[in-house]
From Swiss-Prot:
The organism's taxonomic lineage, starting at the top: Bacteria, Pseudomonadati, Pseudomonadota, Alphaproteobacteria, Rickettsiales
SUPFAM superfamilies per the UniProt record, alphabetical: Thioredoxin-like (SSF52833)
Name of the protein in its database record: Glutaredoxin 1
Organism: Rickettsia prowazekii (strain Madrid E)
Family designation: Belongs to the glutaredoxin family.
Stored NCBIfam families: GRX_bact
Amino acid sequence: MNKSILHTIIIYTLASCPYCIKAKALLDKKNVIYEEIEVSNLTQEEKEKFIKKSGGKSTVPQIFIDNMHVGGCDDLFNLEKEGRLDKLLEHQPKN
């Protein structure tokens, strides 16, 4: 598959965050590839960009699918509960 058409999942996390672990477990269960970005490793400028990209939210996790801000852990699980997550993930690269 051409890399330029790959869809992407990015999750901003902190290692000790239980909600981050829960969100990653759901993505792992869905067998999709995602990029994890540890917020504590970001520079101040990168943190400011992350907060802006997240609509002013600085909490973690913050999840993006194809550059669309999904939100946090509860938002991800709500998409799953509503049956909408699989549709968002259907074109994602699989593990």
